[in-house]
Every structure is written in C-alpha cells, then in structure tokens.
Amino acid sequence: MADRTSSSITIKAAKADIMAVIADLEAYPEWASGIREFTVQETGPDGRALRGRLTFDGGPFSDTVGLAYTWDGDDRVSWELVEKGTVVTGLHGTYALAEAGGGTEVTYELAVDVRVPMIGMVKRKGEKRIIDSALKGLKRRAER
C-alpha cells in the first residue's frame, strides 16, 4: 500500500475544534458523504476511539470494515484497517492539522486496497473523490 493520495484544505477554525469534529466518529454520517454508519467499539482514556466499525456506500462498492485509531493530540490522527471487509482489503488514512494564518490547514491522506483489480490511476481518482468530499464536509461542519 505504498501509493497514497492526499489533499489539503484551510478551515477557519481552531485545531482543537476541528479535531473535535474528526473525533466524533459516530456523527460522520451527518457530514461525510458515503458514510452510512460508524460504531465506536473501544475508547481510550481521553474518550477518543481506539477501534470502530465503519459502513460506507462508495458508489459501486459498499462495505463494512474494522479500523484502529492512533491520536496525536489535536495535531494528527491515523487509522489502519484491522478487520477486512468483503471489498476493502487494506486501508490507511491520516488527518494532519497545522495552524495556518487565522485558520487551520487540514491534510487528509488515504490509501485503499480492494479485492477487485483496479488500475492505479482509477484507484487514486476514487481516493481523491473520497478525500475531497470528506474535506469539504469537514470544513462545512467545523465552520458552522
């Protein structure tokens, strides 16, 4: 899973406020298109998810997967696939937040592997669509 796709957006909100939106995983269906359900299965001492199950509808593919999360304060969160779905066989993602002139720059990086053979360019285009949609939804949610 060496190839990763990433994109960034500047959000007019503090890092802590944006990370609070990101950390509220069970609310993702309200603002992240394609996410049907998220269930937190285990939390850490800070109340943030350590493990969860994500169900998504991604156009031609729908799946449910298990994810493990690693949090670095309000600076970064990463997640890894720990329970494969019927379609998704590998997944790694991160949100990295950095202060940027009156706002916060949020960079979302994603790599997804699927059982269905897919040309790299098509796979990256799909990842880019997921990332851009998530960043726009995050911006709307955090700036409201």
Predicted regions and their residues:
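Structured catalytic core of nucleotide-sugar glycosyltransferases
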Residues: 4-5, 17, 54, 64-66
